[in-house]
Amino acid sequence: MKTIAFDFDGVIHKYRDGWKDGSIYDEIDESMILNIRYLLKNNYNVFIMSTRDPDQIKQYLDRYLRIYEFNTEKRLFNVEVFPNSQKFWNKQGILGVCSHKAVFDVLVDDRAITYNGNSKDVIEQIINFKTYQKDLIDYSNFSKETFNSNQLRLPFKYQNCK
């Protein structure tokens, strides 16, 4: 079965203001949690790989999972930190968390470029790279009147999102 690694900041933790003071300050992306649950239920090995302290991530996830369980009476999954000496994560049904590069088949990351074997494309991709957050609309410069007017139009790619 495949092993799937997830980055934490920008993928699971929304991370809208960057690193800041190192705290985990933002909301969890609930759709990614449900994706992880789906993978775990379907016998994929899944772990989070981050430069953050894995205990910090585990505490954040445990707090969210307790709230979810209280509100829905459903347990999503358990979370376990694994040590730097462990290179493989293969505990079925449990989300692993580590701060080192462990072995994986697929990586889900908001700051990665897929290498397609053509080294000539890499430099251009690096120079032009933007995270998905950079494509989101910045509403900070809009006035209240703008939000209430008919002038506000979403870019085409967002028009059919619900």
Predicted feature residues:
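HAD-like aspartate-dependent phosphatase fold
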Residues: M1-K162
